[in-house]
Structure formats: structure tokens, C-alpha cells
Amino acid sequence: MQYEHKILLVDDEPLIRRSMQKTLSRLGFEVITADNCIEGLTTFEAAQRSDNPFDLALLDLNIPGFTGQPQEGAGLELLSRLHEKSPNLPVIILTAYDEVHKAKVAISRGAREYFVKGRDEGLVDLMDAILEK
């Protein structure tokens, strides 16, 4: 299958990761997953060195950080590191928490959007809108 866009999905919850990967793959996205900041950054760097870099990243807000331990807001640290390497990479922060202040922090740090997990409707439309820009 020829994919139109390559997506990095970083989430530490296996069920959510598999479900999102399956759904997005069926819709024509190539989805590469990681379950923590270290793996996410390593995967991103490898793709950047290839001729097939990522077009967009979906990052869970609270994932194991660069210490390997679960860390609140670690997704924001990964966001910063990804933007050091690729400033124009569109990033959507995923979270289970519907809190406006977290959305503002994510966007102020360079995320294009903030999406609350569990409401799957709307994510693909959001991704399409960002990728079309």
C-alpha cells in the first residue's frame, strides 16, 4: 500500500497505540509507533536521516520521559526536542485530560493542536487540515 503521509505516534498505553495505529493505517496513513520519549526521539531521528521523514507527530502528554520513568508533561519535552531537529514538524498533543491550561501550554510550546483522547471523531479531520497547510 502506498501511504500519503507518515505519522509518528508516541503513547505509552498499548491498547490506545494499537487502536490508533490500526484506524489511521486503514485510512491511508503510515503510522510508526513508540511508547516513550527515548524511543520516540530515536525513531524520529532515524526517519529524518532517511528519504522518508515524518509528516506529523501525535504525542501523548504524559508518557515515560527521557529518564525512562513516567513523567507528567513528558510529551511537551519530546515536542521541544523534535522541534529542535525539525522546527516545522506539525505536532498534535494527545491527552486524556480536557484542561484548557494544558492546551495553552502545548500550543505555546509549538504544538499545532491539542486533542483529547477518547473522542476519536475529529482527529483525522484535524490531521488532514494540518497536513494540507
Question: Which residue stretches match the model-derived regions?
Answer:
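Conserved acidic carboxylate
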Residues: 11
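Alpha4 helix (beta4-alpha4-beta5 surface) of REC/receiver domains from two-component response regulators
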Residues: 69-73, 77, 84, 97-116
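Two-component/phosphorelay signaling modules centered on CheY-like receiver
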Residues: 14-32
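Two-component signal transduction core modules
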Residues: 57, 91, 114-115
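Receiver (REC) domain switch/output surface
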Residues: 124-133
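Conserved phosphotransfer cores of two-component systems
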Residues: 46-51, 81-89, 109
